[in-house]
């Protein structure tokens, strides 16, 4: 009957009639696409046909990556072409890594930097940098900037009453009078020594360096007698030992004028 001849069987029936084994997978490359056809059994133990279509794209990869793709394969993939084989290789999705840093350590480092920023203030343009690094240093801007005249401070009501007796200079200050054990009348326990200073260091730069840490009573910048340049070290006497310890903690190892400062406690001199 002609009607029966026109009926065609399905591909699954043809595969079952040919043999009980699965046919090998096939690949067809045309029009920039690769069609991969393979056969397998599903969970119901039935033969199914899986067709995958890939779009072929050309990418510029490093030479080492291209060389690695041409390595000789082994095992079940010994006769495969370059690239992953879906029967032996499972290509998963790309996983992007995100490195999370410790926020507490970053916050500690930021706090340390902020404390140093508060120290640096230019006396020329009042910027957040040292005066020796100011771009306006030595220009007309510095020469034309007027220095404010400090207002007269009223006399303190707690000033000592003049008795008419002679008081030595070493005993006129109330703080120095309490240091009767020191023959020179000075307190070296609040003094620090700053070394590794540049030759261009001045008294104004030294005062700017330490004035925001705490009040000080005396400063000494060692200078060469012939050239007048800084010898590289200075002494600062603070009014409190706590401010001196803070200065050592903040300034020791700090960069100033392209040099690393070395700040330590001043060693007391032996009285002569």
Swiss-Prot record:
GO CC annotation terms, alphabetical: eukaryotic 43S preinitiation complex; eukaryotic 48S preinitiation complex; eukaryotic translation initiation factor 3 complex
Where is the protein localized? Cytoplasm
Q: What is known about its subunit structure?
A: Component of the eukaryotic translation initiation factor 3 (eIF-3) complex.
**Domain RRM: start-end pairs:** 190-268
Q: What is its main location?
A: cytoplasm
Question: Which protein are we looking at?
Answer: Eukaryotic translation initiation factor 3 subunit G
Q: Which GO terms describe its molecular function?
A: RNA binding; translation initiation factor activity
The UniProt similarity line reads: Belongs to the eIF-3 subunit G family.
Q: Name one Pfam family in it.
A: eIF3g
Q: Which CDD domains match?
A: eIF3G, RRM_eIF3G_like
Keywords of the record, alphabetical order, are: Cytoplasm, Initiation factor, Protein biosynthesis, RNA-binding
GO BP terms: formation of cytoplasmic translation initiation complex
| Region: Disordered, residue numbers | 1-28, 143-187
What's its job? RNA-binding component of the eukaryotic translation initiation factor 3 (eIF-3) complex, which is involved in protein synthesis of a specialized repertoire of mRNAs and, together with other initiation factors, stimulates binding of mRNA and methionyl-tRNAi to the 40S ribosome. The eIF-3 complex specifically targets and initiates translation of a subset of mRNAs involved in cell proliferation. This subunit can bind 18S rRNA.
């Amino acid at each position: 009957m002609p009607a029966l001849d026109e009926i065609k069987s399905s591909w699954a029936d043809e595969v079952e009639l040919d043999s009980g084994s699965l046919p090998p997978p096939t690949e067809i490359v045309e029009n920039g696409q690769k069609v991969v056809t393979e056969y397998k059994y599903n969970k119901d133990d039935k033969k199914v046909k899986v067709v995958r279509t890939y779009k072929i794209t050309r990418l510029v990869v490093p030479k080492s990556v291209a060389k690695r793709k041409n390595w000789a394969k082994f095992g079940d993939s010994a006769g495969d072409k370059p690239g992953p084989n879906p029967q032996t290789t499972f290509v998963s999705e790309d996983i992007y890594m995100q490195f999370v840093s410790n926020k507490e350590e970053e916050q500690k480092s930021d706090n340390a930097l902020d404390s140093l920023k508060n120290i640096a203030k230019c006396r020329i343009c009042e910027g957040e940098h040292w005066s020796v690094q100011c771009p306006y240093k030595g220009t007309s801007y510095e020469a034309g900037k007027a220095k404010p005249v400090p207002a007269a401070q009223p006399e303190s009501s707690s000033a000592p009453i003049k008795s008419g007796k002679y008081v030595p200079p070493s005993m006129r200050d109330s703080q120095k009078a309490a240091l009767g054990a020191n023959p020179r009348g000075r307190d070296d326990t609040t003094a620090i020594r700053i070394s590794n200073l540049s030759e261009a260091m001045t008294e104004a730069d030294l005062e700017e360096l330490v004035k925001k840490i705490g009040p000080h009573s005396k400063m000494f910048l060692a200078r060469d007698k012939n050239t007048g340049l800084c010898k590289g070290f200075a002494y600062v006497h603070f009014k409190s030992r706590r401010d001196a310890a803070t200065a050592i903690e903040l300034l020791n190892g700090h960069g100033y004028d392209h040099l690393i400062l070395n700040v330590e406690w001043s060693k007391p001199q032996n009285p002569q």
